[in-house]
C-alpha cells in the first residue's frame, strides 16, 4: 500500500472487462491515482449477491466507472458504479420516460432493452425491445407483441387482434 490511503470515489475508465474468473471484475485506468498504470482487478460492488443469485452486469470497455479502494489500499480496487460522460451516452430507451416520471431502463449497446415506466396510458408500463424492432409492450391499455417485420398481435380488453384486423377474436 502507498503511504497515504486513498479514500473516496475516483473517476476511472474501463480498459479490460474480460474477467478470467467471470465474477464481474474489471481493470481500469484511474487518472488521479496512476495515469498510465492499469489497476489490478477491481472487484464489483453489486446491489445483491449470493450463491446462484444476484445482479450481474459488466461495463463495456471505455465506459466511465467510479472506483474506491478497500481500506484505502490502491492494490484492492472496487468498482462501485458507472457514470455517463455526456447526454449522448444515456440509453436511447431512457428518453421514452419523461423527466420527473419514475422509470427504469436497461439497455445494451446494441439497443436491446427493457423500459418500465409509470407514464399513464399506452406509453407507460413495460416495454421489451430488440435491436431489430421486435417488441412486447404491456400497459394499462393492453398487450402488444410484434416481430418487427409486420406481424402484430394486440390484446385490448376482451379483443385479440392479429395483423391489424386480418383476424379479430372477441
Question: PLM features: residue spans?
Answer:
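Hydrophobic packing positions characteristic
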Residues: 1-155, 170
Amino acid at each position: 500500500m502507498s503511504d497515504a490511503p486513498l479514500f473516496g470515489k475516483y473517476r476511472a475508465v474501463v480498459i479490460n472487462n474480460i474477467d478470467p474468473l467471470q465474477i464481474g471484475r474489471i481493470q481500469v485506468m484511474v487518472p488521479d491515482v496512476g495515469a498510465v498504470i492499469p489497476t489490478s482487478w477491481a472487484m464489483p460492488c453489486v446491489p445483491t449477491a449470493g450463491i446462484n443469485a444476484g445482479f450481474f452486469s459488466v461495463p463495456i470497455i471505455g465506459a466511465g466507472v467510479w472506483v474506491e479502494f478497500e481500506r484505502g489500499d490502491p492494490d484492492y480496487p472496487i468498482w462501485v458504479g458507472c457514470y455517463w460522460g455526456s447526454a449522448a451516452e444515456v440509453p436511447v430507451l431512457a428518453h421514452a420516460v419523461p423527466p420527473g416520471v419514475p422509470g427504469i431502463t436497461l439497455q445494451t449497446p446494441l439497443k436491446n432493452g427493457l423500459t418500465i415506466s409509470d407514464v399513464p396510458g399506452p406509453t407507460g408500463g413495460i416495454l421489451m425491445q430488440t435491436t431489430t424492432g421486435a417488441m412486447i409492450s404491456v400497459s394499462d391499455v393492453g398487450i402488444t407483441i410484434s416481430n418487427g417485420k409486420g406481424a402484430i398481435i394486440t390484446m385490448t380488453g376482451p379483443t385479440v387482434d392479429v395483423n391489424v384486423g386480418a383476424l379479430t377474436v372477441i
